[in-house]
Amino acid sequence: MADWETRAVRSDGCRIAYDCRQGEGPEVVLLHGYGLDRTMWAPQLVALEGWTVLNLDIRGHGDSRPCADFSIPQAAEDLRAVLVKERCRAPVLVGLSMGGYVVQEYAWQFGGCAGYLVAGATPILLDCYSGWERAGLRASTPLLGVWPWRCLKSAMAMACSSTAVSYTHL
């Protein structure tokens, strides 16, 4: 069983932290959802035993700080910095929710991956929202800004979790 090593790369003023485990096959690169960090992938890491895995904290999440600004294109640049540092030739990118947006943006900007998997609540980055949906998203930004993070995280956990274990570890 290979050991995990925590590594980091600097990208546009932010330290991008990730765990790396050497193994076989193409690199599997995991990108978490909004408000989470790389620890969300713990159950999947068991199934990936023996594979080479890079498990990132996306900019502004977990140990990837400081983060003055965030954008999906910048997160894709951060991902590229990690892949260049690790000399990944044909990684398989796995993104959940916001991580799926980053995977799509990376594919759009850079391409060159063996495969992509975008899972869970990640529409393609095209003009897929109606005018009402776009207005609702714009209105939600200031509302979320006044909601205490602790309460927002708890509400997200309740909405997304189906077991006590998943709720308490979110």
Language-model region placement:
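N-terminal cap/lid segment of alpha/beta-hydrolase-fold proteins
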Residues: 2-15
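Short glycine-enriched nucleophile-adjacent loop
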Residues: 100-111
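Active-site loop/oxyanion-hole signature of alpha/beta-hydrolase fold enzymes
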Residues: 42-43, 54-94, 98
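Structural signature of beta-strand start/N-cap positions in the alpha/beta core
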Residues: 27, 52, 90-92, 114-115
